[in-house]
Regions:
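Hydrophobic alpha-helical transmembrane segments in multi-pass integral membrane proteins
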Residues: 49-56, 108-119, 164-176, 225-237, ...
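Structural signal for membrane-spanning alpha-helices in multi-pass inner-membrane proteins
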Residues: 49-56, 81-84, 108-111, 130-141, ...
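Hydrophobic residues within membrane-embedded alpha-helical segments of Major Facilitator Superfamily
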Residues: 16, 23, 76-77, 83, ...
Length: 287
């Protein structure tokens, strides 16, 4: 890993995504659908991409390899998000999120097998603890009012699990031959291309809040997500997937949980508290 830049970018990503996670439900609870929230997120990627392009003189790599790798990273992330919307319609969140939360397992395996990444015994201990913490942090008590509908939800959850796990590997692989700014540009383009799909998935038969507490609230919240996505790409440029991916995915939810406790007085379940403890130890070991 190159100096400690990976750590700085990873921490910034965790902070932005942690705060984003604490507020992301507000627009939806106010009547602004999550699918349209995706469209807002895709638009907030544009100013971040503009900054990235400015850094490299407004000329991203445009050879076929760069276009394919950058677009693949974007499609895996954005398509995974859209599939998640449909997954949550078919299966309860308390079953879906523990499956998806383990996507860094895919990232770690691919990076070890295909990139030959290694880590110290101390870091490996942190990686294992982070992977154990993720399903605990996403734990939600079973609810009789939201039973699973068939088995398709599990297949869809696995698709998201694979997509997001492979995305982290692709980001690191792409960073070896192209600039991070170019990767983010293509991620933005592919995210925008899928906006019509998100709009198509929206149920316009239900009332939609188009006011200040709807899309206008979603915009600054989603901007946090977009900035975090940009710094995540930089983190993968300077750091190893086997360290960066588990760290970000384990620590960002901890920040969300702490903020939810402070802002909404939401007391986490003891299973979640156990996950927070594991994540904290993992962070110390991997830092």
């Amino acid at each position: 890993m190159e100096s400690n830049l990976w750590f700085v970018y990873a921490v910034v990503t965790m902070l932005f995504w942690g705060v984003w996670g604490a507020f992301i439900e507000r627009p939806e609870k106010n009547g602004f659908p999550a699918t349209l929230g995706y469209a807002v997120w895709a638009l907030t990627m544009v100013p971040c991409a503009a900054v990235a392009l400015w850094v490299i003189g407004w000329v991203p790599e445009h050879d076929l390899r760069s276009i394919v790798l950058g677009s693949a990273a974007g499609l895996l992330g954005a398509a995974g998000q859209l599939v998640l919307f449909d997954t949550l319609r078919r299966g309860p969140a308390y079953l879906v999120f523990p499956v998806i939360s383990l996507s860094p397992v895919v990232s770690v395996l691919l990076s070890v097998l295909l990139l030959g990444e290694t880590a110290s015994p101390r870091a490996w201990a942190g990686i294992v603890l982070a992977l154990l913490a993720m399903p605990l942090l996403s734990y939600q008590p079973a609810s009789p009012s939201s039973p699973a509908k068939g088995r398709l939800w599990f297949v869809l959850a696995l698709l998201v699990f694979l997509a997001w796990g492979i995305q982290a590997y692709v980001l690191r692989f792409a960073n070896a031959t192209m600039r991070s700014e170019s990767i983010f540009f293509y991620m933005t383009v592919t995210g925008l291309l899928l906006v019509p799909v998100a709009v198509w998935m929206t149920d316009f038969r239900r009332p939609i809040n188009w006011g200040p507490s709807g899309p206008w609230l979603a915009a600054p919240i989603q901007l946090l997500n977009s900035i975090g996505a940009l710094t995540m790409v930089y983190a993968f440029r300077h750091g190893k997937v086997i360290i960066v991916s588990p760290m970000i995915n384990a620590l960002a939810p901890v920040i969300t949980i702490v903020l939810s406790l402070l802002l909404y007085r939401v007391v986490p379940h003891r299973v979640v508290v156990a996950g927070m403890a594991l994540a904290a130890v993992a962070f110390y070991l991997m830092a």
